[in-house]
Curated annotation (Swiss-Prot):
It is found in: Mitochondrion inner membrane. This is Cytochrome b. Component of the ubiquinol-cytochrome c reductase complex (complex III or cytochrome b-c1 complex) that is part of the mitochondrial respiratory chain. The b-c1 complex mediates electron transfer from ubiquinol to cytochrome c. Contributes to the generation of a proton gradient across the mitochondrial membrane that is then used for ATP synthesis. A ubiquinone binds at residue 201. The lineage of its organism: Eukaryota, Metazoa, Chordata, Craniata, Vertebrata. One of its GO terms (biological process) is mitochondrial electron transport, ubiquinol to cytochrome c. It comes from Cephalophorus rufilatus (Red-flanked duiker). It is a multi-pass membrane protein. Heme 1 (or BL or b562) is low-potential and absorbs at about 562 nm, and heme 2 (or BH or b566) is high-potential and absorbs at about 566 nm. The cytochrome bc1 complex contains 11 subunits: 3 respiratory subunits (MT-CYB, CYC1 and UQCRFS1), 2 core proteins (UQCRC1 and UQCRC2) and 6 low-molecular weight proteins (UQCRH/QCR6, UQCRB/QCR7, UQCRQ/QCR8, UQCR10/QCR9, UQCR11/QCR10 and a cleavage product of UQCRFS1). This cytochrome bc1 complex then forms a dimer. Binds 2 heme b groups non-covalently. Its main location: mitochondrion. The chain crosses the membrane at residues 33-53, 77-98, 113-133, 178-198, 226-246, 288-308, 320-340, 347-367. Belongs to the cytochrome b family.
Amino acid sequence: MTNIRKTHPLLKIVNNAFIDLPAPSNISSWWNFGSLLGICLILQILTGLFLAMHYTADTTTAFSSVTHICRDVNYGWIIRYMHANGASMFFICLFMHVGRGLYYGSYTYMETWNIGVILLFATMATAFMGYVLPWGQMSFWGATVITNLLSAIPYIGTNLVEWIWGGFSVDKATLTRFFAFHFIFPFIIAALAMVHLLFLHETGSNNPTGISSDTDKIPFHPYYTIKDILGALLLVLALMTLVLFSPDLLGDPDNYPPANPLNTPPHIKPEWYFLFAYAILRSIPNKLGGVLALVLSILILVLMPFLHTSKQRSMMFRPISQCLFWILVADLLTLTWIGGQPVEHPYIIIGQLASIMYFLLILVLMPMASTIENNLLKW
């Protein structure tokens, strides 16, 4: 008799995705981040669900409901901080996952890659709306500043912003709809993640060499299930260390006073995981130009397959490209630092140089390096 996991309509899908899936024998720990992102998403949905049970999406009570969760609800404080810091872990895993894709040329799986970019946008939108919900000072002003960027769109801009706000400023209507969207989006992300996996399983995983691994496959279970469990344990360890020892480390103290439309915080800035994009936005003096640069800083990922000029897929055997890749990482860290600094000398010029460097590396220098490496192969 055939095993039930191979015949049952539902179990068959699980089996083909997580048990009998043929996987490359040499994928490194950089391939763990996909499963870690899945765990982050499940964790965020669960903690978010329990927070939503006690949260009220109303301007007068939102802030106090979050305070109530932290003070009066059983283990409310740990649920709240797991949710807030879980978002940080989510983005750390996302950046690692995307970086892995760039380094090892995984973007040549076009469908998987493009769904991944959509997932990145969806996650960023969700995190932004979630940051507005506690209705602290930075929540309110962050929402005001970022939504206001849409007014840079010619002709329809102002109407669009007021439509999103549900009024003439960020108010009750805005908070309520942000809560509604923040609740539904993770489920859309989960659905997209399944499509992401569906496309990935059409081709199979890439591996560090970038060479086809069809000749040397091993079953996903037990090899990669146990490896994923180890990754998950390390993720939970890191998250709980953050939550239990320094839960406010990555937060902004400016979000502790309740929202006050009459008082602007000295430095409006988003959570740390948006700072690199925020720095690119601020480095262009023109409003529309800044917004375009902001969107393009992420959307540029879609161009990666077309900018790939190398004869090799992975960067494993391409030292010049490796150097440029790590310069890009350093550049992104510089942008993240600049995004959190006030708009004054020397930060302005550093931010502008780092922004130029970012686009220059991706659009010009890396494709050039690949071409040079192709020619070096002939020697």
